[in-house]
């Protein structure tokens, strides 16, 4: 039998890159993996219990909340917050920051999207959890505040996501490569399946919702015309691959190459995706895998956030593809 490496073992081995660490980050990532198992348990049997459909409320984004959204949010807060390792947390589903109980010894910040792509739950399309970890800036954990959450993405110490699909996959980085794990339900463990993931420099797929084409700016329209025009030298035309679940679309492009685009529109001039919960963690992962992520004008990880639920346009994926998209957005083509 091949040497099976669990995510817990792999995380422990990653400690060698942090000689000053005392195992805290290892415990945090292990907690996240445990929370993912709890969410996975309910996602796979959502159709058998009364957890599908709408909860009859809206979140801070003004979106209708799914029952499974609420469950995932509650499970993550409960499973992770109870240990006191995080001084402060932020969730896409909560308007304000979350101060966990016993946070006096917490030295980290957790920001997360409990269930990305939740509009797909009822039709059995892949959904996922996205998370981001930062060091606490405040010297006293008991005084952790919103300011500790509003850090640039370049300050992340770890980020990752979990996809609940035909198989359950967890991908994470601590700034030393990107690693993927597949959940084995027979033993209840995430096992290493993809070590040191690298994304192709150029792909042949693009992922975006073209339903808002009439509201796209001229740069976006010209870029779409460009990637649909035949040119063998640049592997065009590109093919569309779009699920409507950010984490699933991103994961596919990470492995196969390509670009995910959520541009500004007339209705959403500042974009629609959340900087802190979606763009930053995925940008960190993408760059660690050799890719690129921008808002069309600025590197995502350099953006200085001013709001917990700040939105941003997003161009993320293979470096060459993103750079070309930027040139169109900036009027250079």
UniProtKB/Swiss-Prot annotation:
Give the matching Pfam families: FBPase (PF00316), FBPase_C (PF18913)
Is Magnesium included in the keywords of this UniProt record?
yes
Main location per the UniProt record: cytoplasm
Q: Which residues bind substrate?
A: 116-119, 209, 242, 272
Q: Which GO terms describe its biological process?
A: fructose 1,6-bisphosphate metabolic process; fructose 6-phosphate metabolic process; fructose metabolic process; gluconeogenesis; reductive pentose-phosphate cycle; sucrose biosynthetic process
Name the needed cofactors: Mg(2+)
- Residues that, per the record, bind Mg(2+) 2: 113, 116, 278
- Pathways involved: Carbohydrate biosynthesis; Calvin cycle
What NCBIfam families does UniProt report for this protein, alphabetically? PRK09293.1-1
The family annotation for this protein states:
Belongs to the FBPase class 1 family.
Name of this protein: Fructose-1,6-bisphosphatase class 1
């Amino acid at each position: 039998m091949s040497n099976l490496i669990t995510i817990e073992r792999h995380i422990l081995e990653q400690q060698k890159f942090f000689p000053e660490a005392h195992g805290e980050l290892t415990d945090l990532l292990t907690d996240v993996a445990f929370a993912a198992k709890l969410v996975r348990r309910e996602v796979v049997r959502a159709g058998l219990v009364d957890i599908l459909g709408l909860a009859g409320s809206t979140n801070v984004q003004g979106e209708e909340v799914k029952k499974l959204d609420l469950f995932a949010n509650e499970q993550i807060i409960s499973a992770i917050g109870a240990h006191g390792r995080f001084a402060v947390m932020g969730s896409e589903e909560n308007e304000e920051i979350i101060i966990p109980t016993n946070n006096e010894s917490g030295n980290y910040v957790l920001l997360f999207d409990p269930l990305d792509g939740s509009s797909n739950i009822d039709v059995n399309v892949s959904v996922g959890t996205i998370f981001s970890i930062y060091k606490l800036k405040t010297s006293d954990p008991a005084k952790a505040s919103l300011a500790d959450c509003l850090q640039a993405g370049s300050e992340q110490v770890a980020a990752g996501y979990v996809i609940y699909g035909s198989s359950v996959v967890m991908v994470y980085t601590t700034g030393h490569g990107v690693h993927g794990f597949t959940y084995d339900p027979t033993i209840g463990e995430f096992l290493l399946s993809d070590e040191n993931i690298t994304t192709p420099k150029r792909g042949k797929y693009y992922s975006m919702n073209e339903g808002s084409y009439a509201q796209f700016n001229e740069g976006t329209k010209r870029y779409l015309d460009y990637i649909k025009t035949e040119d063998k030298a640049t592997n065009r035309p590109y093919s569309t691959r779009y699920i409507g679940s950010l984490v699933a679309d991103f994961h596919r492009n990470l492995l196969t190459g390509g670009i995910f685009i959520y541009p500004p529109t007339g209705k959403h001039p500042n974009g629609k995706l959340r900087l802190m919960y979606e763009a930053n963690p995925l940008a960190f992962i993408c760059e660690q895998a050799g890719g690129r992520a921008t808002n069309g004008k600025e590197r995502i990880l350099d953006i200085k956030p001013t709001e917990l639920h700040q939105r941003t346009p997003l161009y993320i994926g293979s470096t060459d593809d993103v750079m070309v998209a930027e040139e169109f957005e900036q009027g250079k083509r």
